[in-house]
Amino acid sequence: MTDLLDRVDAAVAAAPATDYYLLDETLTDSERAIRDKVRAFADHDVLPIINDFWERAEFPFELVPKIAALGVAGTTIEGYGCPGMSRLAAGLVSREIARADGSVNTFFGVHSGLAMGTINLCGSDEQRERWLPAMARLERIGAFGLTEPRHGSDSVALETSARRRSDGFVLNGRKRWIGNASIADLVIIWARDEDGDVGAYVVEKGAPGFDPSSVITRKLGKRAVWQAEIALEDVEVPAENKLANARTFKDAGRVLTTTRGGAAWESVGHAMACYEAALAYAGEREQFGRPIAGFQLVQHKLANMLADVTAAQLMCVRLAQLQEEDRMTPAMASLAKMHNAQRAKAVCAAARDVLGGNGLLLDYHVARHMTDMEVVDTYEGTDSIQALIVGRDVTGLSAFA
């Protein structure tokens, strides 16, 4: 197996990344440079070590300073030490990290997209200045606490409470499946006040009554990123830690609309990795006296996989253009997330089939991408929830209740 694995790895490394419709030609020099440096990081720093961390369900802390050195945290945010890159460049960052590993991409996406994104969208200028520069340098890690044990898809019904007091708020409740929670320096907690209004509160590491230590490890996807259940028992939050412009659940929705686009890009990264692995494997694996790439059944699978990858790439590029023009709607983001997650899961499964039994081994990476895609399909709104958002948009009728 080692000889075959070495040949497949060499073939993947030597081949150009999948770009069948020559989308690379549409990138600016800046976008291409960002893509190239993140790809180099993913190939040289993430890919060689990630299987071991994934298998042990441990987070690769050694990568944090290397991610910081890339200078991409905060992606599209202007100022505050953030790069202010284009929406397309931000998508390429997510795609390239995910091509190597979904866990590392989730760590980055939660920190940069959900935590920093919420502060940027919902915070005052003073709050942005207070937190974003250190987060851009990854000196402080962020997390985003919305999902609860009893409320996943129905997150609008959240039960975590924020009770007013003279100098701030007291938070009580539980959050679950919170990425980065156990290692974060600050967690944005969405909670409901006495008037029923939903707001966002920045809880800092070490706050009395704040316990993010219940790490969820017995999972089969995204094993190298730590997700946890958070307990909040009479956690005191100063008034200045309530984000100034987070006043309703719609503000959480604004954040998720943006990050769903990121999940669509992530799906492309997983699909590209699996297609490229299957193509290389088919060229190296011989059965019945010739490479299996020469058989009609395998070529049919590869052609279908390439079609799915290319369609997902095109959808992401157009979505980024619409977002740059401030014309992207929540339903557009949902459609991209739904479609790309569906097709990426299909590509990963087809790649596993092309690799046969070897597709189940971590060594070939496909199995890791396949199980990680189950997580992508679930978080930031399941396939079914995205379909209801799109359905409501095209029919004018809500099927949520």
Regions found by a protein language model. Give the residues of each.
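Hydrophobic, small-residue-rich alpha-helical packing segments that form membrane-like cores
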Residues: 153-154, 169
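A short core secondary-structure module
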Residues: 172-213
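A structural signal for short hydrophobic beta-strand segments in well-ordered beta-sheet cores
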Residues: 160-163
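A short, Trp-centered hydrophobic/proline-enriched beta-strand micro-motif
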Residues: 138-146
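C-terminal helix-coil-helix/basic helical segment that borders enzyme active sites and/or dimer interfaces
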Residues: 47-55, 279, 283-290, 306-339, ...
